Amino acid sequence: MIASLRGTVINIGLSSAVIECNGVGYEVVTTPNTLSQLVRGEEALVLTTMVVREDAMKLYGFIDNESREMFSVLQTVSGLGPRLALACESVLSPLEISQAITNADAKALQRVPGVGKRMADRLIVELKGKVAAFAAGVVDEAGEQISLPNANIASEVVVEQVSQALVGLGFSEKQSDDAVSFVLAADPSLDTSGALRAALAKLSGK
């Protein structure tokens, strides 16, 4: 299994990046938050997990071991695959996911596009005994975290990545751009995860 990649970022797309290692480009599917911390042409270390299906093999990438472990734990829920697991981590941090499950906060989980009441309840029932380590913050942080780019680049990337993520979740470009502009005008210090959560809250009328 490919557990990590260290190499040059040669492309950043809507939901994935390509990292070149020893002349081979690996496509890594990941969250907007991880994508926002990659810079084209620079070296990065991304922790990975491979998901093998009958029709495809995909690499999923994460900035830290906690996120990677949560991705695996989420997929132990019946009916929840890698796509929805990644959507959960696009909206909520591992700590927020674990807190929502521990506190039986179905509404917090339903902020994730694709997670309805039934799936939220299933997450709470099936994972309540599996997320204590995340809530306590004691998951082993193996591997380095990706360095953040400078503030100007980060600001531009937040706008682009959050807008693209919202479009990927089914919102129109205008809805996405308007929501991102609104939340960043209210709080310019928001990072990608924070801006995405705030934009989703605005779009859902919460």
From Swiss-Prot:
Keywords: Cytoplasm, DNA damage, DNA recombination, DNA repair, DNA-binding
Single GO molecular function: four-way junction helicase activity
Database matches in InterPro entries: DNA_helicase_Holl-junc_RuvA_I, NA-bd_OB-fold, RuvA, RuvA_2-like, RuvA_C, RuvA_C_sf
Region (Domain I): 1-63
Annotated compartments: Cytoplasm
Positions of region (Domain II): 64-142
SUPFAM superfamilies for the chain: DNA helicase RuvA subunit, C-terminal domain, Nucleic acid-binding proteins, RuvA domain 2-like
Region (Flexible linker): 143-153
Biological function: The RuvA-RuvB-RuvC complex processes Holliday junction (HJ) DNA during genetic recombination and DNA repair, while the RuvA-RuvB complex plays an important role in the rescue of blocked DNA replication forks via replication fork reversal (RFR). RuvA specifically binds to HJ cruciform DNA, conferring on it an open structure. The RuvB hexamer acts as an ATP-dependent pump, pulling dsDNA into and through the RuvAB complex. HJ branch migration allows RuvC to scan DNA until it finds its consensus sequence, where it cleaves and resolves the cruciform DNA.
Family recorded in the similarity comment: Belongs to the RuvA family.
Domain notes from UniProt: Has three domains with a flexible linker between the domains II and III and assumes an 'L' shape. Domain III is highly mobile and contacts RuvB.
Subunit structure and binding partners: Homotetramer. Forms an RuvA(8)-RuvB(12)-Holliday junction (HJ) complex. HJ DNA is sandwiched between 2 RuvA tetramers; dsDNA enters through RuvA and exits via RuvB. An RuvB hexamer assembles on each DNA strand where it exits the tetramer. Each RuvB hexamer is contacted by two RuvA subunits (via domain III) on 2 adjacent RuvB subunits; this complex drives branch migration. In the full resolvosome a probable DNA-RuvA(4)-RuvB(12)-RuvC(2) complex forms which resolves the HJ.
Name of the protein in its database record: Holliday junction branch migration complex subunit RuvA
Lineage summary: Bacteria, Bacillati, Actinomycetota, Actinomycetes, Mycobacteriales
